[in-house]
Each structure stands twice: as C-alpha cells, then as structure tokens.
Amino acid sequence: MRIALFRSLGLFVLVFAIDQAIKALILGGFRWESEALSITLAFNKGVAFSMFAFLEGWLKYIQLGMLGGILLFLAYDRSFFVAHYLPLSILLAAGFSNILDRFIHGGVVDYVYWHYGFEFAIFNFADVMIDVAVALFLWQTFFKQK
C-alpha cells in the first residue's frame, strides 16, 4: 500500500505539474500554427465539446464533488486503489488540474486545435491524460492477468 501511495503521489505531481506548466506557456502567449494543428488559447466553460457550459460557475463545484467522491471511495476500498493506482493517479491529477483552471481562469485552458480534414474540439494535455487513464483502467480491468 505504501509503495502504491508513494508512486501515486509522484505520478499525480508529475502529470499535474506538466499540465500546469504547458498552460502557463500558453497563457504567456505561446502560439504555433500548421496546416493540421494549431496551438492557440481557448477557455472551455463546459466539459468535453463544451457540454454543460450552461452550468457556468456550478460546474467546477460539481466536478470537485465528483473527484472528492472518488477519493472517498478510494479511502474506503484501498485494494481498488492498490490495483489501479496508475490510472487513478493520472485521472485525478488531470481532473484537479482542469478544475484549478476553472477556479483561476473561469474555464479550462485549452490549446491544441486539430483542423486537418475536419475540425476537432480544442483540448489540452490533461484531457489526453484522462483518455490515457481510462485506457489503462480498461486494460487493467479486462486484459491484465489476475
């Protein structure tokens, strides 16, 4: 349990710090353009594809409550945490980083804009890490030998 907790905290800090450092660069004015991809600043007031933007200021508290619920569950079921600390650490770090954006900037700082062939939603490193965490969790659940 202690090793999992130590690794989890380290990974949490790493993912959180990388995401916030990239966002600081973007907020500082860094931009980049190409035919397929642009790095540009956008504030997402909703969640994926700007859904639930109508919740405005309440969304950050709802998300904070959801992450708090996950933490309470993990405190209750420590074996689940030990089995899945890797994706959980990534998920929580990315989630808390995006929630911090909502408190500080009024919306999530997004910056990666894919526009080759079709226009895709703008996203950030934390969003990618959430996808990675879900993929890892699914792999551990369905394919990892027990």
Swiss-Prot record:
Record localization: Cell inner membrane
Pathway assigned in UniProt: Protein modification; lipoprotein biosynthesis (signal peptide cleavage)
Spans traversing the lipid bilayer: 10-30, 54-74, 80-100, 118-138
Superkingdom, taxonomy of origin: Bacteria
EC number annotated for this UniProt entry: 3.4.23.36
Residue pairs linked by disulfide bridges in the UniProt entry: none
Membrane topology: Multi-pass membrane protein
Classification via InterPro entries: Peptidase_A8
Keyword terms of this UniProt record: Aspartyl protease, Cell inner membrane, Cell membrane, Hydrolase, Membrane, Protease, Transmembrane, Transmembrane helix
Gene Ontology MF terms: aspartic-type endopeptidase activity
One Gene Ontology CC term in the entry: plasma membrane
Classification via Pfam families: Peptidase_A8
Active site as annotated: 110, 127
Catalysed conversion reaction: Release of signal peptides from bacterial membrane prolipoproteins. Hydrolyzes -Xaa-Yaa-Zaa-|-(S,diacylglyceryl)Cys-, in which Xaa is hydrophobic (preferably Leu), and Yaa (Ala or Ser) and Zaa (Gly or Ala) have small, neutral side chains
Role of this protein: This protein specifically catalyzes the removal of signal peptides from prolipoproteins.
Family: Belongs to the peptidase A8 family.
Record-linked HAMAP family: LspA
The protein, known as: Lipoprotein signal peptidase
